[in-house]
Every structure is written in structure tokens, then in C-alpha cells.
Amino acid sequence: MNWLNNVVRPKIRSILKRETPENLWIKCPDSGQLVFYKDVEANQFVIPGSNYHMRMGATARLKSIFDNETWFDVALPDVAADPLKFRDERRYADRIKDARAKTGMNDAVKVGYGRIESTPAVVAVQDFDFMGGSLGMAAGEAIVTGLQLAVEKHAPFIMFAASGGARMQEGILSLMQMPRTTVAIQLLREAGLPYIVVLTNPTTGGVTASYAMLGDVQLAEPGALIGFAGARVIEQTIREKLPEGFQRAEYLKEHGMVDMVVHRHEMRPTLARLCRLLMKVPAPHADEVAAPPPPDVEGPPPAAEPVALPPA
């Protein structure tokens, strides 16, 4: 190595270290166009032009729904992380650890309490990035806790569903969450409070046989895949070709399974109107929307601050 290499090498090394971030560009699954990630993020993860709705994380979803992007992060009960000591190709405990590192969440469901255009509401969001949004003990406990809080606060409960189904690594303990959440929804109904479901892409498996299809009002995002079994499984079983768009939000709306297909940019005002209608609350004046709550009503602190539920 001569003296020239000694001079040039550090610069070359610094150039090699300049790596392009993996998520700098996003390819639209619908149109194939490349879009700058920050533009998609600023557009609530809707691809400009094609209007394709990308998957949205739980925190980003809550920010897009609540007034001033603030809410209570509801503290959730601890559950056994790996009750069956399950192992397939990898240990289930390791899969949980990786999912937590990837998403920053403890499990697949995040619950927040705040205001939507000045109307108090409890919102639960499934994050598909956490093991496919699968329903396990922790996710079931989060939904039940959110429903209990809605009854306590006399507020509507909104569920954003996104899941591949029950979490098989937890066996019967996972399947048990289907009747548990159903019973909790019934308690909400007995309290005279609305239950609104937003079906996002994808919502499949066991969740569609329980809480995801029990809403007083069923909304869906455009193009969302919604169904119990996969299309290929159904075709192989019935030995027939399925109709165009089968199991998509628009098809389900045409056949009465979904009440409304709502663009993500219209989701917040739509939910606010539904909450006011079902709770029989008058619409606020324009200057009151996203304004601080009255002194006698406790408003939501910043999202990072958790709040513990009182004992039952």
C-alpha cells in the first residue's frame, strides 16, 4: 500500500458507510410507483395518486384519530408471556422478544383514551407488525380492559382490527380470548354504549369470528382484506372460482357485511359523527373541536404518560 492509498482510503471508507435507509422509498403494491416514505407518512400512509392504504402502526393510528394527537396510554395487565413454553422452528419467547423490539409495543393491541372532535372515546388498535396482529392472551386482555374502561368512563369503544387470526403458539388460551372479548362487548351493550369496528387490511381468521364482526356499526378501509378463511382455501373446498373482489371491503359492503367504506382521511370526522349520533351528543361548534375540555372533565395528558385502571 503506497502513500496515495493511505490518503485516499479514509474518504472511500466514509463513502462506503453512507448507507441508504431501507424505508427511504416505498413501492405502491397497487400501481407499482415509488413514493418517498416521508410523503407517505405525512399522508397517513395513503399512497398519493393511487390512494392505496398501507398498513398503519398503532401509535400513528392513535395520533390520526385523537384531538391534538394526545391521549391516555391505558396501562394493561401483565399476562404470562409464554404460558405453554411453545417452540416450533424457534422459541415463542424469542419471537415475542423480536416483535417487541421491532414495534416498541408490549403486544399486538394498544389502547388509548382521549377525545375525537371533543367527544370522549376509548380506542383499541391492533398492530399487524406485531406477529401479524394475532390474538393472544395479552391482546385479549387489552381489549377487555379497554371495554371495561369504556363502561367506567361511559364512552364509546372503537376497535381498529388488523389480524391474521388467533395466536397458535398459545393454543386454547388464545382461542379463549374469542368468547372473553365477546362477553365484554355484551357488557358494553348492556351499559347502553356504542361499539364501533373499523376493519383494516387484513382482518382474517378468528377475530372475524368474534369481536371484529360484532360492531353496532361496521366500517372498513378501502381495499381491506376481510374474511375467515383464505380465498385459495375456499376455492379448493367448494371447487369453484370466487367472484372478482371477493373478501374485499367494497364487496362486503355491497353484500351487507360492512356498513361503510371510509377513506382514512375521512375516518376521524366519520367516527366523531357516529359517536355523537349514538351517544346523542350535539355537534360542537367549529371553534370547540380539538379545544381543551371543560374544567369538570379530565382531559387526556400526553400519550407517553400511562394511566393505571382502578381495581374492578
From Swiss-Prot:
Pathway: Lipid metabolism; malonyl-CoA biosynthesis; malonyl-CoA from acetyl-CoA: step 1/1. Keywords: ATP-binding, Cytoplasm, Fatty acid biosynthesis, Fatty acid metabolism, Lipid biosynthesis, Lipid metabolism, Nucleotide-binding, Transferase. One of its GO terms (biological process) is malonyl-CoA biosynthetic process. Its EC number is 2.1.3.15. Residues 291-312 have a biased composition (Pro residues). Belongs to the AccD/PCCB family. This is Acetyl-coenzyme A carboxylase carboxyl transferase subunit beta. It comes from Afipia carboxidovorans (strain ATCC 49405 / DSM 1227 / KCTC 32145 / OM5).
